[in-house]
Regions:
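Short glycine-rich anion-binding loops that position phosphate/pyrophosphate groups of nucleotides
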Residues: 17-18, 89-93, 169-171
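Short active-site oxyanion
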Residues: 31-37, 110-114, 162-163
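Conserved helicase motor
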Residues: 60-69, 142-146
């Protein structure tokens, strides 16, 4: 039976982005008490749990390839009264990481979802950019190439709010060139 308040509860737990010291005390408490931890990568989550002194946790891999199948397993455990924590490799589950479809399925099945907030790459990038923070939008990763990428950039070119994008370091130079082509050289950009 669950040791978290509320049996059959799914808890999204934000994890550190690069600095394990950013794991909150509340996150450690929830992860310690969870009957099951759904995670993007069991090896990386194992390292995080070890750092926090958490042992004996039951882990279930939930990534972009397994999220749909894993949702059924999570719902079954919730229906048995288990508490399930969800983590990704870094940051908040569901933000350009697995979790969104899982949460939708759990809510549709009538279970409660809670969150332990914490590190968030979009917010960290936004506040350290020096760009306006009162109105902004999160776009995640752009399509990698072709018409989908060109089309998305054209849509974003008319956006007046600050736009937060994710990009891999190896594609950053090409993306900056594409942004300049779509938005013009006068639009400010910050890389965080």
């Amino acid at each position: 039976m669950s040791t978290l308040s509320g049996a059959g509860l799914l808890v999204l737990v934000a994890t550190p982005i690069g600095n394990l010291g950013d794991l909150s005390q509340r996150a450690v408490k929830v992860l310690s008490a969870a009957d099951l931890i759904a995670c993007e990568d069991t090896r990386r989550t194992g390292l995080l749990l070890s750092h926090a002194g958490i042992t004996g946790s039951s882990l279930l891999r939930v990534d972009q390839h397994t999220e749909e199948a894993a949702a059924g397993k999570v719902i079954r455990r919730l229906s048995e009264g288990a508490s399930v924590a969800v983590v990704t490799d870094a940051g908040t589950p569901g933000i350009s990481d697995p979790g969104e479809r899982l949460v939708r399925r759990v809510l549709d099945a009538g279970f409660e979802v809670s969150v332990v907030p914490g590190p968030s790459a979009p917010v960290a990038a936004l506040v350290m950019s020096g760009l306006p923070t009162t109105r902004w939008c999160m776009e995640g990763f752009l399509p990698r190439s072709g018409a989908a990428r060109t089309g998305r950039l054209a849509e974003l070119a008319v956006e007046e709010r600050t736009i937060v994008l994710f990009e891999s370091p190896r594609r950053l130079a090409a993306t900056l060139a594409d942004l300049t082509g779509a938005f013009g050289a006068e639009r400010p950009v910050a890389v965080a």
